[in-house]
Amino acid sequence: MKKVKLGEVLSLKKGKKATVLAEQTTLSQRYIQIDDLRNNNNLKFTESLNMTEALPDDILIAWDGANAGTVGYGLSGAVGSTITVLKKNERYKEKIISDYLGVFLESKSQYLREHSTGATIPHLNKNILLDLQLELLGIEEQENIICILNTIKRLITKRKLQLDELNLLVKSRFNEMFGDPLNNNKKFAV
């Protein structure tokens, strides 16, 4: 298998601070911050101009702060100042699937955190990131890896939901058997 340094594959562009809007307007676009790399629970928007733009094919990585190394992909919009956009160079656009690159970087996030700089606020080390070696697999192999990993992620999510429901069932059975422990409605001796 051929390996390639990320520095050959990617170019980096740092995000910018913007005025944040809670509601979307006709002139606004999505404003992506660190929380958005994990989920879409709290969408924010901006009308600020001259922003760093992310396209769905780009990889986003939290560059600064306690969450440095957190990775997101498949997002589009204006990018906040603590995030860097990783764009595939022309030579590799058709050779590397963004999801494959994204899961590779997710697997390296702890390593990137451990090698970050800054005494009080961690910052990713650009050289460490760009020196990472990516295995250059065929498109079909990349798609297969993504399919398997997505299946695993779905199963993990389902299992977590099952455990949450089981925890609620245990609490419910406890209350049914012994009553509410706060008001002791079953009059147990304390």
Question: Whereabouts are the PLM-identified features?
Answer:
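Non-catalytic DNA-recognition/assembly elements of restriction-modification systems
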Residues: 1-17, 131-146, 158-190
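Residue-level recognition of specific faces of alpha-helices
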Residues: 82, 120-123, 148, 165
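Histidine kinase transmitter module recognition
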Residues: 89, 104, 155-158, 162
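Sequence-specific dsDNA recognition surfaces
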Residues: 4-59, 190
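Basic, amphipathic alpha-helical recognition segments used for DNA target recognition
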Residues: 2-13, 74-76, 84-136
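Short helix/loop capping segments that flank catalytic or ligand/cofactor-binding pockets
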Residues: 41-42, 95, 143
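A specific heptad-register position in long alpha-helical coiled-coils used by two-component signaling proteins
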Residues: 150-153
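A short beta-sheet element
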Residues: 33-37, 50-106
